[in-house]
Design a protein with these regions (language model features):
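Conserved structural core of kinase catalytic domains
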Residues: 29-32, 41-84
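Short beta-strand-loop-alpha-helix junction that forms the active-site gateway
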Residues: 25-27, 70, 119
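ATP-binding glycine-rich loop module of kinase domains
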Residues: 1-42
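Conserved hydrophobic "DFG−1" position in protein kinase catalytic cores
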Residues: 14-15, 23, 56, 65-68, ...
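Catalytic-loop of the protein kinase fold
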Residues: 90-106
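Acidic active-site catalytic centers that drive phospho-/nucleotidyl reactions
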Residues: 36, 97, 116
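Activation of the activation-loop gatekeeper triad in protein kinase-fold domains
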Residues: 115-121
Length: 127
């Protein structure tokens, strides 16, 4: 399984079946894992169409498996970037890391998607 990202905080691999495996490590790895899993479950339950679907989560290994949301985006207009992250709040989540590195492009449906929710916040209902 090829490594797509290898940092102090996580290793991300994309399998030949298209599934993405993220192994958390480093500072506050357990807390970041728990938060990302919680946020993805929240977004998946609300039918958010532009985030990965959580397929599996192993708390002992701090490893999760998701669907693949496409390839990284190199350039995006600042206004469109802000709009994309603002759209996430309709589903009750603030990303908290509004950066290009957290945007992908899914060619199958021509959709920009968001990834990496380890620092995201679930907003109170009605916000």
């Amino acid at each position: 399984m090829p490594i797509v990202k290898d940092t102090l905080r996580a290793t991300v691999r994309v399998g030949y079946d298209g599934r993405v495996t993220k192994q958390f490590r480093g500072p506050k790895a357990e807390e970041r894992f728990d938060n990302e899993v919680k946020v993805l479950r929240h977004l998946n339950a609300r039918g958010c169409p532009f985030v990965p679907r959580l397929l599996d989560a192993d708390a002992e290994q701090l490893k999760m498996v998701t669907t693949n949301c496409g390839s990284r985006v190199e350039h995006l207009d600042d206004a469109r970037l802000r709009e994309l992250f603002a759209e996430l709040e309709i589903y009750g989540v603030r990303h908290e890391d509004v950066e290009m590195r957290n945007v992908t492009y899914r060619q199958q449906d021509g959709r920009f998607c968001l990834i990496d929710f380890e620092f995201a916040t679930i907003l109170p209902e009605g916000k």
